[in-house]
Amino acid sequence: MSGGASATGPRRGPPGLEDTTSKKKQKDRANQESKDGDPRKETGSRYVAQAGLEPLASGDPSASASHAAGITGSRHRTRLFFPSSSGSASTPQEEQTKEGACEDPHDLLATPTPELLLDWRQSAEEVIVKLRVGVGPLQLEDVDAAFTDTDCVVRFAGGQQWGGVFYAEIKSSCAKVQTRKGSLLHLTLPKKVPMLTWPSLLVEADEQLCIPPLNSQTCLLGSEENLAPLAGEKAVPPGNDPVSPAMVRSRNPGKDDCAKEEMAVAADAATLVDEPESMVNLAFVKNDSYEKGPDSVVVHVYVKEICRDTSRVLFREQDFTLIFQTRDGNFLRLHPGCGPHTTFRWQVKLRNLIEPEQCTFCFTASRIDICLRKRQSQRWGGLEAPAARVGGAKVAVPTGPTPLDSTPPGGAPHPLTGQEEARAVEKDKSKARSEDTGLDSVATRTPMEHVTPKPETHLASPKPTCMVPPMPHSPVSGDSVEEEEEEEKKVCLPGFTGLVNLGNTCFMNSVIQSLSNTRELRDFFHDRSFEAEINYNNPLGTGGRLAIGFAVLLRALWKGTHHAFQPSKLKAIVASKASQFTGYAQHDAQEFMAFLLDGLHEDLNRIQNKPYTETVDSDGRPDEVVAEEAWQRHKMRNDSFIVDLFQGQYKSKLVCPVCAKVSITFDPFLYLPVPLPQKQKVLPVFYFAREPHSKPIKFLVSVSKENSTASEVLDSLSQSVHVKPENLRLAEVIKNRFHRVFLPSHSLDTVSPSDTLLCFELLSSELAKERVVVLEVQQRPQVPSVPISKCAACQRKQQSEDEKLKRCTRCYRVGYCNQLCQKTHWPDHKGLCRPENIGYPFLVSVPASRLTYARLAQLLEGYARYSVSVFQPPFQPGRMALESQSPGCTTLLSTGSLEAGDSERDPIQPPELQLVTPMAEGDTGLPRVWAAPDRGPVPSTSGISSEMLASGPIEVGSLPAGERVSRPEAAVPGYQHPSEAMNAHTPQFFIYKIDSSNREQRLEDKGDTPLELGDDCSLALVWRNNERLQEFVLVASKELECAEDPGSAGEAARAGHFTLDQCLNLFTRPEVLAPEEAWYCPQCKQHREASKQLLLWRLPNVLIVQLKRFSFRSFIWRDKINDLVEFPVRNLDLSKFCIGQKEEQLPSYDLYAVINHYGGMIGGHYTACARLPNDRSSQRSDVGWRLFDDSTVTTVDESQVVTRYAYVLFYRRRNSPVERPPRAGHSEHHPDLGPAAEAAASQASRIWQELEAEEEPVPEGSGPLGPWGPQDWVGPLPRGPTTPDEGCLRYFVLGTVAALVALVLNVFYPLVSQSRWR
């Protein structure tokens, strides 16, 4: 590797080449210093110290000779390491070095010693240096290492030492020193700037003079080398080229002219670029790409409001660079310190070569479209190069930058397949070999490809990076070559490996990804602790095959060596045990999860021989004792790490409806299947307080569309108005009268949101200390507002004064010529013969001892004013009270002339008739009453029209004596106060009592004597609107005056939204068992439909909650609930649902994984969102939220985790660690293994080797397959839906087609076949 080459010092080229290069560099440096100023003056003593450093390279006699000759200014001296010969006498300078641990390595002098630096390599976050010291074993006590952020010095007991100045800064406080077998010393150096690629381990002396210190904001993720300085970057002077020494070492002396020509071209290209005010390098921009045919690749870059005048795309053979400015506020907020004038740059190193001249781009309103023309017609399988070799070390970076923005499922670029990845790696290897051999193979490349990227110095603000800690490796026996190979194979960050869809296996992929982010389960399987607990003799298990297969798959997901991994082995193991998972049909993710965890439990069950146990009832014993006995009985048969981590316990309570026998048992659970509230409907309910002075309040109450009861409304209103539900009455009003009064158990399924519901607060007998009379009250006018212009029976219009129409005296709404017409029309009219009501009816509750006429009238008038408008017109002197009938009024016809047969056939006789005033031309026949128009609400009583005040004669029947007025009084406009109305001699209304036989009787005012009213009667409030009376009132219905409840404003929006608390409440609510689930009562000796209630008793460390979104009514009627269920991401408190023994700390949980389901019952797609919690705190994450969409893995924000598609939730309990079993050998854990078990153990060992060897490249073309299996898929990978809604539409169409086909097969086909046989 080049790291080792660097350790031996620079290889000298021919003297002529060195002199020419040195002169050219000195000349360019002089020009640069005259333009920008001397960098030594700017940085002060730092450069002075570097200039005075004179280390000697080991094994380089020329360097030693140069030092002896006093040549101190040579530009080819390299600060690499500082070894000193062992066994030589210590000089005073060396003694001073041994005393000071942090001495500046710049001032050390070295003598030639054997080579110490063996190799070095780097990952995304750290650099590992390997030193070989001697032959014998090496102890940490013999090593003295001193680190700073820029350099290090390592001394050994034998007198050797090594050190130097690093290419970039490190975290000196986190540096580690470890010893390995074979006298190896490993130095682990965490990078201060993660994801920054180091071209070399140590820096050259001349580089320190021209490269400024690394900025902590320099976080470049992507290509390892910038092949040309672009607009916005400071051009690197040719003399300061950091790779120039390395290039000189690798060149062939015969190719010097070509090399100098390349450097000259690079310098000329660099000086042509002007430096702008600011330039920000972007590690990632939201994008996607796809291959358009065999010759093109289309890239969509999603940036809005781009300034087209200053934006452009630069193309080269192996990369392209987007330079742009944007005014998009959302984009600028992601980059603090940046504004509309900030220039951004995003460079992408491509997977294969392109034709720059044939590439195009265009700007749209919301994105940039880039079309890349391939140099060769071949399938890329991805956009960016997966990895590259820089400085001799293979850099482990993702195929593409880790996205910082969320993308919908299927919106990310396709990953690189394994075969293409292998070809790319071989291409990199051959390219590296060609560069080492000479310039012949390099001459075809562009000159700028040899320029190593210079660290950015003009970053406006720190950019976010993906800080992914590597997965801890277990100690490996033997050499560390295997570990080094895995590091070199890394192509993505740990935890960003997807799973290939083998064919409708998205349900399996989502479950595996969620379980792989369960911290305790991941660590348990990764460090192979589970091997000590494999139960090889369990007939219910797989002999350890499932556990080992799951461990291999889990390790592959966290090694970062695959973009996507095929879970085919695990699927085959599962299918061998459960035949329903054979093939490529769709399955329920929760069903697969339950089987997988149960299979892992059986493979890891610590119980070798399961004893027989029985379920024991409580029999009146304390719950604590019964629960502990049940748990220990369960652990006698089931004891594994899966039980310790996932299983809890709930209390089941059954009550017999006949004998009231109570049975209490305690059962374990692996997950909680919580039901979802049914679809909601919002009902408007008007609440009337007990006292009429409080204005009614309109509430919006959400109830279930099916199986809802009045108790739901009463309970909701009870919480809002703080009144007990038993003191509330709910009634439905239709056409101004009570349609029905609901009991709490009555159903509301037939009530629609357009119906009118009234809720009344009633006085309780406990509060009144006596009997309370509850009365229904309805309102109606004395004279209805129905026009009468013709006979209702013969339809003959009134012709003359002598032929007057007569009204029906019961309803006053129809008229007849005579009694014969009335008798003819009576069968049709009797169902509608009732008075016309106005306003809203209401309920009043009065203590029996205070039920006086004055109190009753006050309550009635107080409630009535909210739904009717009342106006008393001014008094007219010419109007007098009617003492007798009008002279022109005809005598009432008697009903005695009806035939007896008719009376027997119809016990309800037609009422008497009353004359109607003749209708004039154009007269409506209406009494002069303020009638409410049908087209809108009635105006307020403050404005009275002249039509309302007009009066006209009307013929009426004889009036009761109580209705006569003794003297005229001046009328008071507007509504009168109840006290005034009571004191007035003429009331505005009359009160009638209606008994159970529907007979009416007017109530008389008895002063302070209470009225005797039974519970079976109701009241009618009759308004005096007869214009023939001296003091009449104008009355009409109006819209109910009420106040809006502010808390109900968002009830309509929340109708389709539920909370997890509501679901848990439904889970713990008692329910009646269905007939097919009847419980056998041991006391009745019969099956009973008992009531059952489940309550949580013992909570697990990892709580899995399934939202029961699927409902199966029949084969055809199946449904999925897609309503949003709001669940907490942080701090789920289950203390109110757990009735077990209370602990000191509340049972709080944090979400770490979600399985989502898109689509319907027939077709759908599963994805998963997950994060890796910290091992000590579930609130923190070692790896943030990611979206797993089969083989595509992208980062998402935590705010996007809660969606309406969530199906299975994974919660981790706070401050409740699960102790893992100690790792032990199989013989120690199972000392009595028989030959069969030993054979199974040997087979398990072979499984390890077989499954680990299965980590082969993903075959090209694998992906979401059809139901015919992987071998039947040909062609490129199909792209998933861009957004979840698009996927839902696709699955909805497919589901509809499948439902129609099923309907035809089940309904029409049998009919056709039957008719054919007939």
From Swiss-Prot:
<dbReference type="GO" id="GO:0034976">
    <property type="term" value="P:response to endoplasmic reticulum stress"/>
</dbReference>
<feature type="region of interest" description="Disordered">
    <location>
        <begin position="1"/>
        <end position="109"/>
    </location>
</feature>
<keyword id="KW-0256">Endoplasmic reticulum</keyword>
<feature type="binding site">
    <location>
        <position position="833"/>
    </location>
    <ligand>
        <name>Zn(2+) 2</name>
    </ligand>
</feature>
<dbReference type="InterPro" id="IPR050185">
    <property type="entry name" value="Ub_carboxyl-term_hydrolase"/>
</dbReference>
<feature type="region of interest" description="Disordered">
    <location>
        <begin position="1218"/>
        <end position="1239"/>
    </location>
</feature>
<keyword id="KW-0862">Zinc</keyword>
<feature type="compositionally biased region" description="Basic and acidic residues">
    <location>
        <begin position="447"/>
        <end position="457"/>
    </location>
</feature>
<feature type="topological domain" description="Lumenal">
    <location>
        <begin position="1313"/>
        <end position="1318"/>
    </location>
</feature>
<feature type="active site" description="Nucleophile">
    <location>
        <position position="506"/>
    </location>
</feature>
<dbReference type="GO" id="GO:0031647">
    <property type="term" value="P:regulation of protein stability"/>
</dbReference>
<dbReference type="GO" id="GO:0051879">
    <property type="term" value="F:Hsp90 protein binding"/>
</dbReference>
<keyword id="KW-0863">Zinc-finger</keyword>
<dbReference type="InterPro" id="IPR001394">
    <property type="entry name" value="Peptidase_C19_UCH"/>
</dbReference>
<feature type="binding site">
    <location>
        <position position="791"/>
    </location>
    <ligand>
        <name>Zn(2+) 1</name>
    </ligand>
</feature>
<keyword id="KW-0812">Transmembrane</keyword>
<feature type="active site" description="Proton acceptor">
    <location>
        <position position="1165"/>
    </location>
</feature>
<dbReference type="GO" id="GO:0005829">
    <property type="term" value="C:cytosol"/>
</dbReference>
<comment type="function">
    <text>Deubiquitinating enzyme that regulates the degradation of various proteins by removing ubiquitin moieties, thereby preventing their proteasomal degradation. Stabilizes RNF123, which promotes CDKN1B degradation and contributes to cell proliferation. Decreases the levels of ubiquitinated proteins during skeletal muscle formation and acts to repress myogenesis. Modulates transcription of major myofibrillar proteins. Also involved in turnover of endoplasmic-reticulum-associated degradation (ERAD) substrates.</text>
</comment>
<feature type="compositionally biased region" description="Polar residues">
    <location>
        <begin position="83"/>
        <end position="94"/>
    </location>
</feature>
<dbReference type="GO" id="GO:0048642">
    <property type="term" value="P:negative regulation of skeletal muscle tissue development"/>
</dbReference>
<feature type="modified residue" description="Phosphoserine">
    <location>
        <position position="244"/>
    </location>
</feature>
<feature type="binding site">
    <location>
        <position position="811"/>
    </location>
    <ligand>
        <name>Zn(2+) 2</name>
    </ligand>
</feature>
<keyword id="KW-0833">Ubl conjugation pathway</keyword>
<dbReference type="GO" id="GO:0005789">
    <property type="term" value="C:endoplasmic reticulum membrane"/>
</dbReference>
<keyword id="KW-1133">Transmembrane helix</keyword>
<feature type="domain" description="USP">
    <location>
        <begin position="497"/>
        <end position="1214"/>
    </location>
</feature>
<dbReference type="InterPro" id="IPR008978">
    <property type="entry name" value="HSP20-like_chaperone"/>
</dbReference>
<dbReference type="GO" id="GO:0036503">
    <property type="term" value="P:ERAD pathway"/>
</dbReference>
<keyword id="KW-0645">Protease</keyword>
<dbReference type="GO" id="GO:0008270">
    <property type="term" value="F:zinc ion binding"/>
</dbReference>
<dbReference type="InterPro" id="IPR038765">
    <property type="entry name" value="Papain-like_cys_pep_sf"/>
</dbReference>
<feature type="region of interest" description="Disordered">
    <location>
        <begin position="234"/>
        <end position="255"/>
    </location>
</feature>
<feature type="compositionally biased region" description="Basic and acidic residues">
    <location>
        <begin position="28"/>
        <end position="44"/>
    </location>
</feature>
<feature type="topological domain" description="Cytoplasmic">
    <location>
        <begin position="1"/>
        <end position="1291"/>
    </location>
</feature>
<dbReference type="Pfam" id="PF04969">
    <property type="entry name" value="CS"/>
</dbReference>
<keyword id="KW-0597">Phosphoprotein</keyword>
<comment type="similarity">
    <text>Belongs to the peptidase C19 family.</text>
</comment>
<protein>
    <recommendedName>
        <fullName>Ubiquitin carboxyl-terminal hydrolase 19</fullName>
        <ecNumber>3.4.19.12</ecNumber>
    </recommendedName>
</protein>
<feature type="domain" description="CS 1">
    <location>
        <begin position="113"/>
        <end position="202"/>
    </location>
</feature>
<dbReference type="GO" id="GO:1900037">
    <property type="term" value="P:regulation of cellular response to hypoxia"/>
</dbReference>
<keyword id="KW-0677">Repeat</keyword>
